[in-house]
Amino acid sequence: GLPDGVEDLPKAEDDHAHDYVNDAADTDHARFQEGQLCENCQFWVDYVNGWGYCQHPDFTDVLVRGEGWCSVYAPA
């Protein structure tokens, strides 16, 4: 489950860190590969209405979108 209080975190905005985008379809990053989404990354924890908690140190202060992507994506 999610850590206490996580649902109260602000939602990440595009370019929060590591070329993050809320919609993977919006990125033209060289590292992006089709099918890579926050929701299937090893840093992803859980869903709250389409948003989840990211365990990467640069994202622990925000929620990220399941359909999002960033350049430190790592397959789960």
Curated annotation (Swiss-Prot):
PROSITE patterns: HIPIP
Entry coiled-coil feature ranges: none
Keywords linked to the UniProt accession: 4Fe-4S, Electron transport, Iron, Iron-sulfur, Metal-binding, Transport
GO biological process, one term: aerobic electron transport chain
Binding positions for [4Fe-4S] cluster per the UniProt entry: 38, 41, 54, 70
GO molecular function term, any single one: electron transfer activity
Record bears the keyword Electron transport: yes
Listed Pfam families: HIPIP
Family: Belongs to the high-potential iron-sulfur protein (HiPIP) family.
Subunit structure: Homodimer.
Main function: Specific class of high-redox-potential 4Fe-4S ferredoxins. Functions in anaerobic electron transport in most purple and in some other photosynthetic bacteria and in at least one genus (Paracoccus) of halophilic, denitrifying bacteria.
Miscellaneous comment as given in the Swiss-Prot or TrEMBL entry: In E.halophila, two HiPIP isozymes are found.
Protein name as catalogued: High-potential iron-sulfur protein isozyme 2
Species of provenance: Halorhodospira halophila (Ectothiorhodospira halophila)
